[in-house]
Amino acid sequence: MKLLASLIFFTRLPFWKIADVPPVYFKRVVDYWPFVGWLTGGIMAGTLWITAEFLPVQIAVLMALAARLLATGALHEDGLVDFCDGFGGGTSRDKILSIMKDSHIGTYGVLGLLFYYGLMWNILTTLSVPLACAAILSGDAWSKFCAAQIINTLPYARKEEESKAKVIYDRMSPGVLLSAFMAGALPMLLLLDKGYWWAAIAPAMMFILLMSLMRRRLQGYTGDCCGATFLLCEFSFYLTINLIYTNLW
């Protein structure tokens, strides 16, 4: 039931038709976020693999990025936009939280999204298609695990009734943390050559950097922070894969 709640929460696929999930389970959705990465990463990688057979790789990468956007309903991208607007335009904790809750997109959010997807597209088009697919499957799950550690290291910055999702995530138990780690690391261990495993360090470092920023300026996290952290961790993973690839070849 917890996995189903996570699939319902983090995607726009009709998993809600399977069963009616009680609200209490949505407090644990982050526990299974890396498992959801298997699905969303699989959709993105599968789209790239198939479309690259009959389309130029530049277009295939665009199709792959669009496929995951449709699968997730741009949930994480919404977080990235609000994060950029809040931290870019906010001068105090309260101002940052107020801007992040505003549904309108600002200049910082637009620029952040443009730079993010421009760089992502550039990075993925320079990789071979098999490596790009393996990196996507690996990076999605591992970056979700890294981003999930926000709930274990920071308090929630708002009151529960002020949350967009109307839920505050529970922290992971040691057993759940181990399960999430295995779910995040397994695709990378199975699909990428050992020389690329060094890329796993980049999302961990990105998480530490962002967590420190949130602790200093927000004294906590929000749901938008989780989405932004995932995307930025994933970006750092692909960038490192690209650096290793270009040096090897």
What are these regions (language model features)?
Residues 78, 89, 98:
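Glycine/small-residue-rich loop that forms an oxyanion/phosphate-binding "nest" at active or ligand-binding sites
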